């Protein structure tokens, strides 16, 4: 049988567990209500509907206040950013000042004779001709008007051609500024804001350019010497020098004139070994042939023996001193 003490202990533990369970459930419901104020299902634990309505209204008011505060902060930040951008744009705007006293170099491809002639004594004035035509319309017919106009145009063309032919040759030399006086060296160049260079400044500039060019040539020469240093290039017996003639005597040069050699011929001449001299028969016997100037390297007898040396043309097995000795 279970004693009374154990029963009381179990009851106390159960009561404490129920109290803790209720406490934690209420804390959870409060946290959920703060996180999700729009979700009103968490208020189902409340018994009275009036309490739930009051809680809903309070949550709505708090959310409205928070949203209005956020909107006010955002609007203030946007206004500050716009003001800063406007200030920067106003500071960065270029302020241009126009000076009416500045004389700009506007050149005309005309000589002064042509310009004065066209302005004052033009040979073909349209206004005067039209006034003369329309003044007496009853007396002058259309045919006569056309004839007079054609005659005047022909005269004007002839005069223009005669005058232009004399001045076309001098157009390149007579480029005259329209708004400047004769002595333009005393004025500032309005397009760049710098005075025109004097003769002394031009000479200094030319000397500086020459000096810089000499320094450039020296630097370039040192660079080429460094790149083509003979100590870097390893020369052997078979090295081909492209800029050196492969012929050493005048006879070789005459051969070059008769028959030019290719790069392959030069390479073969450098790489190939010594050519064997043609063999001359000294005497023949029934068993062998003896040649002049025989030695062991061209198929003759080895000194002090009756053994043939390596011929150089046949394989190694033909030599008596090799595998088949």
From Swiss-Prot:
Alphabetical keyword list: Coiled coil, Glycoprotein, Host membrane, Membrane, Transmembrane, Transmembrane helix, Virion
Residues forming coiled coils: 68-97
Residue spans of biased composition, Basic residues class: 55-73
Topological category with respect to the lipid bilayer: Single-pass membrane protein
Location in or out of the cell: Host membrane; Virion
This protein's GO CC annotations: host cell membrane; membrane; virion component
The protein, known as: Uncharacterized protein L309
């Amino acid at each position: 049988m279970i004693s009374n003490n154990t029963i009381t202990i179990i009851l106390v533990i159960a009561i404490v567990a129920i109290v803790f369970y209720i406490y934690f459930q209420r804390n959870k419901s409060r946290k959920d209500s703060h996180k999700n104020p729009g979700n009103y299902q968490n208020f189902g634990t409340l018994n009275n509907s009036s309490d739930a309505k009051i809680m809903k209204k309070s949550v709505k008011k708090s959310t409205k206040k928070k949203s209005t505060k956020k909107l006010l902060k955002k609007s203030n930040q946007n206004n500050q950013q716009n003001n800063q951008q406007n200030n920067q744009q106003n500071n960065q705007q270029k302020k241009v000042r126009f000076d009416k006293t500045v004389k700009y170099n506007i050149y005309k491809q005309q000589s002064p004779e042509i310009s004065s002639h066209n302005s004052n004594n033009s040979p073909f004035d349209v206004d005067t001709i039209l006034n003369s035509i329309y003044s007496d319309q009853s007396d002058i017919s259309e045919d006569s008007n056309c004839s007079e106009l054609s005659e005047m145009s022909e005269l004007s063309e002839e005069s223009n051609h005669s005058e232009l032919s004399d001045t076309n040759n001098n157009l390149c030399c007579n480029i005259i500024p329209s708004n400047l006086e004769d002595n333009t060296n005393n004025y500032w160049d309005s397009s760049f804001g710098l005075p025109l260079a004097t003769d002394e400044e031009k000479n200094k500039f030319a000397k500086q350019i020459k000096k810089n060019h000499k320094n450039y040539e020296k630097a370039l020469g040192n660079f080429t010497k460094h790149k083509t240093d003979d100590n870097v290039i390893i020369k052997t017996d078979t090295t081909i020098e492209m800029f050196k003639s492969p012929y050493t005597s005048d006879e070789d040069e005459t051969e070059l004139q008769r028959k030019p050699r290719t790069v392959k011929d030069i390479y073969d001449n450098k790489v190939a070994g010594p050519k064997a001299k043609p063999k001359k028969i000294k005497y023949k016997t029934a068993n062998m042939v003896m040649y002049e100037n025989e030695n062991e390297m061209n198929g003759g007898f080895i000194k002090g023996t009756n053994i043939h040396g390596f011929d150089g043309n046949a394989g190694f097995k033909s030599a008596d001193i090799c595998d088949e000795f």
